[in-house]
Amino acid sequence: MDMITKMVMERPVVIYSKSSCCMSHTIKTLLCDFGANPAVYELDEISRGREIEQALLRLGCSPAVPGVFIGGELVGGANEVMSLHLNGSLIPMLKRAGALWV
């Protein structure tokens, strides 16, 4: 989990994903379309991906992908991100984290 903590503090928005996951693709597209430029870690393509996936599950991100962190805090998965978007909270959250300069 220390590895995740270090990784999510390096960028305003971090997405843990799998290259074959359609929900991960949807969330990456949404955040990129806003201009957030997230750091994306494809767990099926990096050496410690399995270990990170297990740590995400222990943190409460279920399913583990997509796992979205904004401002160093776990937001959750696709359902949580889409709920924030629909209720108008996502863009202000991205601005507070320094991911958007609008």
From Swiss-Prot:
Gene3D superfamilies: Glutaredoxin. GO terms for cellular component: cytoplasm. The keyword DNA-binding does not apply. The keyword Ribonucleoprotein does not apply. One of its GO terms (biological process) is negative regulation of transcription by RNA polymerase II. It is found in: Cytoplasm. Residues 1-101 form the Glutaredoxin domain. Keywords: 2Fe-2S, Cytoplasm, Iron, Iron-sulfur, Metal-binding, Redox-active center. May only reduce GSH-thiol disulfides, but not protein disulfides. This is Monothiol glutaredoxin-S2.
